[in-house]
């Protein structure tokens, strides 16, 4: 097995702007996960947590909360193949999101996967950069993505 590609400098990372760097494996959200997330977050509307009632909805079943979808993406992408990015940062933080859209509902039991595209890298201060990512979640067989989220990671070099 070949060693994974490594990106170790900001210059190497900037060359990859506009490129998709990771695609996760397919994953299915279970009703149990949706129910637990609903209890933790308070997002427990019937469309998420009542399979019998949701069967008669336009979706034909319960749908995952958008915020649950957003929450599982980091783990999906961390497990995905792709270049290892090690800029030698002392630490990095989730700086936030510029835009999050939930476009197509994910019906419980549908397969979904995540894609990660590098949008930009900006120097913020000496030794501090922002990395701008697009996280896209697609549902198998759907014409439109389930979610598109533009996130920012702050790295302290």
What spans do the regions from the language model cover?
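HotDog/MaoC-like acyl-thioester-processing domains
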Residues: 2-17, 102-157
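Hot-dog-fold acyl-thioester-processing enzymes
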Residues: 2-95
């Amino acid at each position: 097995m070949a060693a994974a590609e490594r990106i170790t400098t900001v210059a190497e990372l900037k060359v990859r702007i506009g490129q998709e760097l990771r695609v996760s494996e397919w994953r299915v959200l279970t009703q149990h996960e949706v129910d637990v997330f609903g209890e933790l977050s308070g997002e427990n509307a019937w469309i998420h947590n009542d399979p019998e009632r949701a069967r008669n909805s336009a979706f034909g079943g319960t749908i995952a909360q958008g915020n649950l979808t957003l929450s599982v993406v980091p783990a999906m992408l961390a497990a995905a193949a792709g270049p290892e990015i090690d800029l030698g940062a002392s630490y990095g933080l989730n700086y936030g999101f510029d835009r999050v859209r939930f476009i197509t509902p994910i019906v419980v039991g549908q397969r979904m996967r995540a894609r990660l595209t590098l949008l930009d890298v900006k120097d913020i201060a000496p030794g501090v950069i922002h990395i701008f990512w697009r996280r896209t979640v697609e549902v198998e067989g759907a014409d439109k993505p389930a979610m598109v989220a533009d996130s920012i990671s702050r790295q302290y070099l």
